[in-house]
């Protein structure tokens, strides 16, 4: 089995092949995201602690977190799931994935070093790979350089040098995201003001409608009362007429 070991602190990654089954037994029956001591791999790994981050079986199917089996299953996957990239909007597909439990049928096991041991591993912990790009978000630039809210972030952007043959060397900087500027604050104030105006307008319209509704209800009530009074007058008139006719007879 091959072990793909990475060390985030230096940005290095190394692929080693382990033929001895006894060295690998410490990883068997362990689940993804489990932290395991790497001492059985050899003397140089003494004190190292690694986390199982994934792997692939001999046919190339990836391990999927949350699938509690050491075999292969077919799952209906959609956008947002691991082990699947949709090609169309809303597309779902049934894909074969391997469970999150490690066994001997894996060809590659991915490990991340959580704690460094006593000795350096050549090509993994003794050298550093510089990051190609610096942080882009304002809060992350502040965190990197330990800046306060009063400091200007724009002066601390990590610029990337661009060199071309026969041309003057220049640098390129990313556009800072979530940067709070007077313009952003102005837009925010405008949004809040517009929201207040909309709320007030809705309130005024609701009050006006309630007033109109009360007026219409009052008019309808008066109309109904007039009709009832008219009906009563007519019925009393008819009653008096019938009485007078009967008395004449």
From Swiss-Prot:
GO terms for biological process: cytoplasmic translation; glucose homeostasis. GO terms for cellular component: cytosolic small ribosomal subunit; nucleus; perinuclear region of cytoplasm. Keywords: Cytoplasm, Phosphoprotein, Ribonucleoprotein, Ribosomal protein. Residues 219-228 have a biased composition (Basic and acidic residues). GO terms for molecular function: structural constituent of ribosome. Ribosomal protein S6 is the major substrate of protein kinases in eukaryote ribosomes. The phosphorylation is stimulated by growth factors, tumor promoting agents, and mitogens. It is dephosphorylated at growth arrest. PROSITE patterns: RIBOSOMAL_S6E. InterPro entries: Ribosomal_eS6 (IPR001377), Ribosomal_eS6-like (IPR014401), Ribosomal_eS6_CS (IPR018282). Component of the 40S small ribosomal subunit. Plays an important role in controlling cell growth and proliferation through the selective translation of particular classes of mRNA. This is Small ribosomal subunit protein eS6. It comes from Ictalurus punctatus. The gene is rps6.
């Amino acid at each position: 089995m091959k072990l793909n070991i990475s060390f985030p602190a230096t940005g290095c990654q190394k692929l080693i092949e382990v033929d001895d089954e006894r060295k690998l037994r410490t990883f068997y029956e362990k689940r993804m995201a489990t932290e395991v001591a790497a001492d059985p791999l050899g003397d140089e790994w003494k004190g190292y602690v690694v986390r199982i981050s994934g792997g692939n079986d001999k046919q190339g199917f990836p391990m999927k977190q949350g699938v509690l089996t050491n075999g292969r299953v077919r799952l209906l996957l959609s956008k947002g799931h691991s082990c699947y990239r949709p090609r169309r909007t809303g597309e779902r597909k049934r894909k074969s994935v391997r469970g999150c439990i490690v066994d001997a049928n894996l060809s590659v096991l991915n490990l991340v070093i959580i704690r460094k041991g006593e000795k350096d591993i050549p090509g993994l912990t003794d050298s550093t790979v510089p990051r190609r790009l610096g942080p882009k978000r304002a809060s992350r630039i502040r965190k990197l350089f330990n800046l306060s809210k009063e400091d200007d972030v724009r002066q601390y952007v990590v610029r990337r040098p661009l060199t071309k043959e026969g041309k003057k060397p220049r640098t390129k900087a990313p556009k800072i995201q979530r940067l709070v500027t007077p313009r952003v604050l102005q837009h925010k104030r405008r949004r809040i003001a517009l929201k207040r105006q909309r709320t007030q307008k809705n309130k005024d319209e609701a009050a006006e409608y309630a007033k109109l509704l009360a007026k219409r209800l009052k008019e309808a009530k008066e109309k109904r009362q007039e009709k009832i009074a008219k009906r009563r007058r007519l019925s009393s008139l008819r009653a008096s007429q019938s009485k007078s006719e009967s008395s004449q007879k």
